[in-house]
Every structure is written in structure tokens, then in C-alpha cells.
Amino acid sequence: MKKMIAVAFTVCGMLTVSIVAQTTEPGQGSKTPPFKYVWGKAYYILPETTSDESGYFSMCEGLNGRIYVGTAKYCVNSYLVEFDPVSEKQRIAIDTHKVCGATGTGYAAQAKIHTRNYVGTSGRIYVGSKQGYRRGTNDTASYPGGYVMVYDPVKDEAKCLGMPYPELGVIDVSADEARKLLYVTTCETQNWMIAKIDDLKYRKIGPMLFGYATTLIDGKGRGHAITREFNLATYDPEKDEVKVQTIKSPDGKSLFLEGSAGIPNWIIAPDGRTAYLLRLGEATLFSLDLQAEGESVTAKPLGTMVAGENPDSRGALTMGPDGLVYAIVKINNKTGFGTGSLHVLSRFDPKSSRIEELGVIAVKNKDFFDFEKAKAAGKSWIHGYHTLPDGTLTPLHCHMAMVAAKDGTLYVTILYPFTLLRIDAYRTEGLNVTK
């Protein structure tokens, strides 16, 4: 068994540690990779719920310990799938068309659940639907608009909560159940909207938002979102007003990055005021004080989560029960050990300001999907993995969502085929699942 070698270096004034060797694990051959693996068990998400083996940022852990994943079935429908970590069984929790009474096909279909699933204090799970893509020149259908939906795991009941904005999909839903408020972001035009849960009368409340913007609700009950100019918009429900603060780096510069590179992914800490932010096209982790006063708020750089070329992090940012911030970043594989890309898991410790690269995520049960059989059958959309020189199966193109469960288990979604990967290495107790 080989020893792990920790190489420490400083990024943005913070200590970063990379683990560059590995112990013996399943899947290794005679060759030794120059990095450690983080092993996960893969589960093929119900194939009848997708068309192109894909889903997006939509994943959460319910209060019952089960995992809920949104899927995309272009031109047809979308679904919320429930995964039970104990039985390892899956089932459909939401059939969007059935719940909302939708009948559209092609571009008119409710083809994606793309929202980051929001779990209310009641345990109810809030999601939204949006359009997919046109398939061919004959698809001239108009998209009617997306719906907000809620699923109650206790009652096993889903409800439609209306269409916030005709002809626009829903890219984010957050619920302040204490104040009976729903926050919604639309797409492809990013309107920031609000409604009372009791009457579902949606209205715009503030400036236009950045692409794929999400709402964080702080400890004071205020909603926060990133504007189109990459500033901080804060809605105070007591005053029914929005305040915008400029987001600046410590040297006074704007954090604005144009286009998809700047897409923000952020989470809020248990203190109800600290937000951690990671953008799609870079690997720098920032913290923001959502309760800061004044005309601007400082985005403090905490360091580089994963060092490498062409960083790409999707919805893979989460906080574990240990208080650590976990992230996955895809980088170009420049190690000489295989080609393509590597999806690296890292974590940040707020107490020590230390970043640790934990390793490349890898699949320990390579037989979870029969790639050769699918290829022989002419199946498309199965190109999302590659095999490294030691025989290890690892993601190639796209990771999407990541959540940390209450027991410390990490769950990651991967495209092509659409996969749920369960990482047990950081679990602190038995699987946390209730009936």
C-alpha cells in the first residue's frame, strides 16, 4: 500500500493541500496514478425519465434521508425521481405533466426540472419546470411557460403552484415557509419574482438577475440574488423593498465575468449570513457577508478549490454536516496519466482557511451500466465516462449537482448515462433514512 503525499502551497494567501498519491483501491491495475481517487457507488437513474441521459442542478436530500433528482426528457416531460439509499431503489415522485395538467409536446413540453431543489422547514420539496430544445424544423410549438411544483414526501403528494410568467421557464424556486413566500427566477429572461404561498399571485420584485441565479434566504428572513451586473440584490419582506449592493473584491474591482463563465453557484452557511460562492468558469471560492451594511459588499477570495487548466464547476458546491465546504471542479488532465479531463473533489475548512484536494472521483462498480451492450444497440448519449490507464472508470464530460446528506454522504450527478454517484468516504454514521 502506497503512502499518500500531501503537497502544500499558497493560493490567494490561503493554504492549499493536494493529495498526489493513493492507496490501493478497486479498479487499479499495475499502473499507479499520480493522484488519489475518491470512490463512489454509481446508480443508473431511471432511464424512462430522460431522453438524452441528462439532468441538471436538481438534487436534494429530503428530511426523510432520501435523495430527489430532477430529470429532463426533451419534447416529452420531466420528472422528480426519489432514491432510497438503504434499499437502493428508485421511483418517480413527480410526473410534471400529470401534476400540472400539461399536454404539450416538442418545444411546448415541460421538458426539464432544472431548479436546485429547495427543502422547506416542513420537509416539502419545491421545484420548477422549464422548456427543452426544438428538435427539427417541424417543431414550431410555442412554449406556454414553466410551473412551480411542491412534493410532500410524508403524504406522497405533489401539487402545482402555478405558472409565474407565461412563455418563460422556471430556473429557481426557494420557499420561506415561515413567511409563506415563494421566490422564483425565470428563464431565459431572468426575472426575480415572489408570491404568497396562500394566493400564488406572482410579481416581479427587483432587477434582472444573472443567468441561472438562485435565491438564498438569510437568518433575518431576507432573500438574496445575484443581479445581471453581478451585484447583490436583497429583498426585505417586512419593507417589501429591494436594495442592491455592489459586489467587489478586496482590491475594489468588480467580480463580473461575462457569459457562462460567470454563472454563480452559491450556498449559505448555518450562521444565516455567510454565503460561499463558486463560479462555473473558475475555481476560486469566495465568501460574502449577506448582512453587511453599506453600498457594497466584499467578496473575499478564500483560495483555489482545484488547481488546473480550464476549470469547470456546475452545481457541485455543498456544505457538509462537518461544517466544511465541498466542491467538484473539472480540469484538463495534464498529468500524463490518461487524457481528457479529471473531476476533482476538494473541501474548504472555514475554521483553518485550509483547502484540501481530496482526489479524482471514480466509480467502484463499473458494471452499473453495460456500455458495450448499449453501444452495440446503437444507444446514444453514453459518452460521459472514460477509463484511465489503470482501468478506473471516471467521469469525462459533465458532473452536475452535488449535495451532502445529514450523515455526511456526498451525492453527485453525472451525465451520459445519467448517474447518481454515492460517496461514502466522509459519512460519519449509518445511512440516515426514515420511512
Model regions: which residues?
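Beta-strand-rich domains and repeat architectures in extracellular enzymes and scaffolds
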Residues: I45-S78
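Short, conserved, GDST-rich strand-edge loop motifs in beta-rich repeat architectures
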Residues: V127-G145, I328-H343
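Blade-level signature of beta-propeller repeat domains, shared across WD40, Kelch, NHL, RCC1
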Residues: D390-K435
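Surface-exposed loop and turn segments in beta-propeller and other repeat-based domains
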Residues: Y43-E48, A93-A109, G162-G169, L209, ...
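Residue-level detector of Asp-centered blade-edge/turn motifs that repeat once per structural unit
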Residues: E61-N64, V119-S122, A175-R179, I217-K220, ...
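Loop/turn-rich, solvent-exposed surfaces of beta-rich toroidal or solenoidal domains
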Residues: L277, A283, G308-I382, H386
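Repeated scaffold domains used in trafficking and secretory/extracellular systems
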Residues: E53-S58, G101-N117, E167-S174, M208-K220, ...
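Blade-loop segments of beta-propeller domains
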Residues: E88-S122, V127-G132, P164-Y165
